[in-house]
A protein has these predicted regions:
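Generic recognition of long tandem-repeat/solenoid scaffolds
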Residues: 12-16, 78-81
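DPxDG-like acidic metal-binding loop motif
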Residues: 18-59, 63-64
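Generic structural signal for well-ordered, non-transmembrane alpha-helical segments
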Residues: 128, 132-135, 169-176, 212, ...
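Extended, amphipathic, non-transmembrane alpha-helical segments
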Residues: 143-147, 181-185, 224
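Glycine-rich phosphate/cofactor-binding loops in nucleotide/flavin-utilizing enzymes
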Residues: 233-289
């Protein structure tokens, strides 16, 4: 990814940068990007001082989303080349803890918009897709078990075999627990947003991180269930064009997303809980103004 930079000019900013993985860019009317001011690149490539809103017709889309799965997201590269963005179409970076509250917090009446955490929404989106895909695989797996025989001795219907009903039960177990945990996490998120609104305070940051812990594990549980079903179903579902293939490709790509890395978020939470800075985070903390 090229360095993203902007220069402050009269009435706004001139912005230049290259952004990969911009999901939905082909159908968007406006796109949102973060830029660093020319004199503030201390955090390197990911430095972000200002979030901008840029019309679709002022950017170039490079169709480079040539990946194994999730092709429908259209997560292509977007190039911004010396585009002027007026100041009223920008907000400060949400990475800056010393900045004033976002003006949009006062626009909507719903507590999730007025007090909710952005990370909670993003993590829930990815996790729900993982669980939905796992349920799709579960449907295929049940159909397979009901209609096929085993391929090794004893040659019996899979429903009568000692192991296949158990494999199905284990898959249901993992998916049901993941879904129930996600729904409860979402309920806890909304409850905390309402409490924060009633008490005129920020969303509890420790709870926010714990909710993220839950959601990432939910996605992993769904993925583990999919791998169990894929492995025990045999090669029957691996034919070209089979829905099994599509689900496997999509799940494998989904699990590479940075919002479904449970080990990383567990390390992040644990270090903060014991008063330590997350690894490499020192450069991302701006100095108090």
């Amino acid at each position: 990814m090229a360095r993203r930079r902007q220069s402050e000019v009269d009435g706004g900013y001139r912005c230049t940068g290259t952004f990969d993985y911009v999901s939905g860019c082909d159908t968007a009317t406006y796109l949102t990007f973060g830029f660093a001011l020319d004199d503030d690149l201390s955090a390197g490539e990911l430095a972000t001082d200002v979030i901008t809103l840029i019309p679709f017709d002022q950017v170039e889309i490079i169709h480079n989303w040539d990946v194994l799965g999730l092709r429908g997201t259209g997560s292509n590269r977007v190039v911004v080349d010396d585009v002027f963005v007026p100041a009223h179409m920008t907000i400060h970076s949400f990475f800056d803890p010393f900045a004033a509250p976002f003006p949009g917090r006062t626009v909507h009446e719903a507590a999730m918009y007025r007090r909710g955490s952005l990370a909670g929404l993003v993590f829930a989106e990815t996790c729900s897709v993982a669980i939905g895909a796992a349920r799709g695989v579960l449907d295929l797996y049940e159909e397979s078990i009901r209609t096929r025989k085993t391929t090794v001795l004893p040659l019996v219907p899979m429903t009568e075999h000692a192991q296949y009903p158990r494999f199905y039960g284990e898959a249901v177990q993992g998916i049901e627990v993941a879904e129930a945990a996600l729904l409860q996490t979402n309920a806890d998120y909304m409850a905390e947003a309402r409490r924060a609104e009633d008490e005129d305070r920020d969303f509890d940051p420790d709870l926010d991180r714990r909710l993220q812990l839950r959601m990432q594990l939910c996605a992993k549980m769904a993925y583990d269930a999919v791998l169990l079903m894929m492995r025990t179903n045999g090669s029957a579902g691996m034919r070209t064009g089979a829905m099994w293939q599509r689900y496997l490709r999509d799940m494998n790509v989904l699990m590479t997303h940075n919002t479904v890395q449970p080990e990383l978020v567990a390390d992040f939470y644990g270090r903060l809980h014991f008063g330590l800075m997350p690894h490499g985070a020192e450069s991302l903390v701006p100095q108090a103004r």
